[in-house]
């Protein structure tokens, strides 16, 4: 613990024998032993309390994770699945009611109205004119289907045909050059 070797302990014993004297040395050693015992007991008590606190913290963590698993498992029960499906169906039915046209007010309340009421203009049904962003997006989508390499197509130039028949002879000469 203190990294004291046998030779160092012997030196301390000799110095204590000379400084304290042979008469009082056993009482001093007994007192030092008692202090060491008290220090060890306090250290072990502290260590025990610390380990107990760690066990309690681990138990609290285990209980918390167990409760989370229990809550998750209750959501997977058949009745829990059916209730969530029922909620989804109810939401879908509520959305269907949005598409229905608004019913007109009763005839009694419609009679006092005059032509002074201005109806809201109808929204146009024509699509919006194309924007620059639309063309950029279209070009980006077209680029996906194009090949990765840039390929240049070469079209052969038409050869002028002379009246004297020199063009067929030149074509045969090119064929011979390609063959070799």
Swiss-Prot record:
GO terms, biological process: protein transport by the Tat complex
Renumbered residue ranges of the record's region Disordered: 95-180
Low complexity compositional bias, start-end: 103-123
Transmembrane domains' residue ranges: 1-21
GO cellular component, one term: TAT protein transport complex
Subcellular location: Cell inner membrane
Keyword terms of this UniProt record: Cell inner membrane, Cell membrane, Membrane, Protein transport, Translocation, Transmembrane, Transmembrane helix, Transport
Signal sequence coordinates: none
Any GO molecular function: protein transmembrane transporter activity
Basic and acidic residues compositional bias, start-end: 170-180
Pfam family, one: TatA_B_E
Domain of life: Bacteria
InterPro entries hit by this protein: TatA/B/E, TatB
Membrane topology category: Single-pass membrane protein
UniProt keyword Transmembrane, yes or no: yes
Keyword set includes Metal-binding: no
PANTHER family: SEC-INDEPENDENT PROTEIN TRANSLOCASE PROTEIN TATA, CHLOROPLASTIC
Physiological role: Part of the twin-arginine translocation (Tat) system that transports large folded proteins containing a characteristic twin-arginine motif in their signal peptide across membranes. Together with TatC, TatB is part of a receptor directly interacting with Tat signal peptides. TatB may form an oligomeric binding site that transiently accommodates folded Tat precursor proteins before their translocation.
Family: Belongs to the TatB family.
Assembly and oligomerization: The Tat system comprises two distinct complexes: a TatABC complex, containing multiple copies of TatA, TatB and TatC subunits, and a separate TatA complex, containing only TatA subunits. Substrates initially bind to the TatABC complex, which probably triggers association of the separate TatA complex to form the active translocon.
The protein's name in its UniProt record: Sec-independent protein translocase protein TatB
């Amino acid at each position: 613990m203190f990294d004291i070797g046998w030779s160092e302990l012997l030196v301390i014993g000799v110095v204590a024998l000379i400084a304290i004297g042979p008469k009082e040395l056993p009482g001093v050693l007994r007192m030092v032993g008692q202090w060491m015992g008290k220090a060890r007991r306090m250290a072990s008590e502290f260590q025990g309390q610390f380990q107990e606190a760690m066990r309690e913290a681990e138990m609290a963590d285990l209980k918390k994770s167990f409760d989370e698993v229990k809550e998750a498992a209750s959501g997977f029960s058949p009745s829990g699945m059916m209730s969530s499906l029922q909620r989804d169906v109810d939401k879908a039915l509520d959305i269907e009611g949005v598409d229905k046209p608004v019913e007109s007010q009763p005839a009694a309340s419609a009679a006092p109205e005059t032509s002074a009421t201005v109806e809201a203009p109808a929204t146009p049904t024509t699509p919006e004119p194309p924007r620059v962003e639309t063309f950029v997006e279209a070009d980006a989508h077209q680029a996906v289907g194009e090949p990765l390499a840039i390929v240049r197509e070469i079209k052969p130039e038409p050869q002028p045909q002379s009246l004297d028949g020199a063009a067929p002879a030149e074509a045969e000469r090119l064929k011979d050059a390609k063959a070799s």
